[in-house]
Amino acid sequence: MAGGFVSQTPGVRNYNYKLTPKVFVTCFIGAFGGLIFGYDLGISGGVTSMEPFLEEFFPYVYKKMKSAHENEYCRFDSQLLTLFTSSLYVAALVSSLFASTITRVFGRKWSMFLGGFTFFIGSAFNGFAQNIAMLLIGRILLGFGVGFANQSVPVYLSEMAPPNLRGAFNNGFQVAIIFGIVVATIINYFTAQMKGNIGWRISLGLACVPAVMIMIGALILPDTPNSLIERGYTEEAKEMLQSIRGTNEVDEEFQDLIDASEESKQVKHPWKNIMLPRYRPQLIMTCFIPFFQQLTGINVITFYAPVLFQTLGFGSKASLLSAMVTGIIELLCTFVSVFTVDRFGRRILFLQGGIQMLVSQIAIGAMIGVKFGVAGTGNIGKSDANLIVALICIYVAGFAWSWGPLGWLVPSEISPLEIRSAAQAINVSVNMFFTFLVAQLFLTMLCHMKFGLFFFFAFFVVIMTIFIYLMLPETKNVPIEEMNRVWKAHWFWGKFIPDEAVNMGAAEMQQKSV
């Protein structure tokens, strides 16, 4: 039987709830949206290391890879090859802006469905690709799907979960992403051993499976109480809230949702309003957290792990196996965040993960520098290569329980309803833009910066860790509608939040500012 709880957080309202099967099931299915993103992250790097794929579409890179005299740092340097990976994220950036309107007007679940549908079409284009144009069209369609899913799923999970467990439930999105990566690397490992072009076609075409999963999931999922109220279905919203909280005593939380909705209706232009001073904390965080998440360098590992491991001297099969190991490590360590984020809070995980990533990145850069040198003509022995893989796993673990899940959780939970869709669109857009830059420029940066590239990312890890320490207040256990109290108490952000904002709605605040 589900136990009864009362959210207990000093200075904010307390809500009644029980851990019901319905909230577990809905959040579990909702998290499927992360699978399409994760599968693509894991599949693209493996496919770009497969010789039949390179020979078919990127013969110049294939010849460089086979050259015995090629600088190890520059073996895979090709703007066209990186465009295959990065084009998805430009499309995701654009679609996330449209997705914010669909998420608000039609509900979170239909935005998720549309994401799965466009991802499905994109997987068909890639699986049957006959030329570069078909590959890129497919990647763009995949990107539209990722943009819709990434915009709607974190918001859906945050709104369905009880405040005290919002972190754990929201981190299901990151778990799904990493699970998708692991499944993709396993598939790549086996398809890479197939003769001819069938292997990479299977890898790319199987992206249709997670797409179908999120489409079916979206059709059977209920919409969130917040979204139902926002669209005028008040009675249905209360019934849904009672259902997912497992109690009829939801009047206080329901009234807060009603108040938040009424306030949001007075805000005609959320994109304009998010620029107002009282929303400065949310604007800065939704810009800087996804920016810093990408500057951890994690997608260097996620996109190009097989390519990177081949650069380190591993064979094709061993490179894919090593990428699979790092993916499994990341999946297991993501569960650490699921079970600790609502107990220890967001800040401690951000800070600890940052320190762990910093130390491992410096060690990786130093070892590669010593072994390859600046010319990139040295050799790395098996024991040293295995040590580098171990250091990469330590780095991935630090990311997996900090910046990985929290980079999606925190931006989705800090914004009031009246700017939530715009804030999440900004979050996804910034994330996708810098994901695109990292994906497009990494192989060129590796060629020119060599082992110094790891020190480059380590520098940003220092900056982001300091930023979190100084600028992010603790948000665990705080209801979304009560978040202004947290910002008001902060040493810096408090000056942007008027005293009345803690107890007064957005509509009244807007009238006072006119």
From Swiss-Prot:
Transport as a keyword of this entry, yes or no, is yes
Q: Where in the cell is it found?
A: Cell membrane
Task: Pull one GO CC term from this UniProt entry.
Answer: plasma membrane
The disulfide bonds in this chain are: none
Q: Which residues lie on this side of the membrane: Cytoplasmic?
A: 1-22, 472-514
Q: Pfam families this protein is in?
A: Sugar_tr
Q: How does it sit in the membrane?
A: Multi-pass membrane protein
Q: Name one GO biological process term.
A: sucrose transport
Upregulation:
Induced locally by wounding, elicitors such as chitin, bacterial pathogens such as P.syringae, compatible fungal pathogens such as A.brassicicola, E.cichoracearum and F.oxysporum, and incompatible fungal pathogens such as B.graminis. Also induced by aphid feeding.
UniProt-recorded Gene Ontology molecular function terms: monosaccharide transmembrane transporter activity; sucrose:proton symporter activity
Per its UniProt entry, which superkingdom is the organism in? Eukaryota
Task: Kindly list the residue ranges recorded as spanning the membrane.
Answer: 23-43, 80-100, 117-137, 140-160, 172-192, 202-222, 283-303, 321-341, 348-368, 387-407, 426-446, 451-471
Which InterPro entries has this protein been placed in? MFS_dom, MFS_STP/MST-like_plant, MFS_sugar_transport-like, MFS_trans_sf, STP/PLT_plant, Sugar/inositol_transpt, Sugar_transporter_CS
UniProt note on tissues of expression: Mostly in flowers and roots, especially in anthers, including pollen, and root tips. Also present in some hydathodes.
Alphabetically list the UniProt keywords: Cell membrane, Membrane, Sugar transport, Symport, Transmembrane, Transmembrane helix, Transport
Sorted alphabetically, which PANTHER family does this protein's record hold? SOLUTE CARRIER FAMILY 2, FACILITATED GLUCOSE TRANSPORTER, SUGAR TRANSPORT PROTEIN 4
Q: What does the UniProt record say this protein does? A: Mediates an active uptake of hexoses, probably by sugar/hydrogen symport. Can transport glucose, methylglucose, galactose, xylose and mannose, but not fructose.
Q: Record's family?
A: Belongs to the major facilitator superfamily. Sugar transporter (TC 2.A.1.1) family.
Protein name, per record: Sugar transport protein 4
Q: Which organism is it from?
A: Arabidopsis thaliana
The primary gene name is STP4
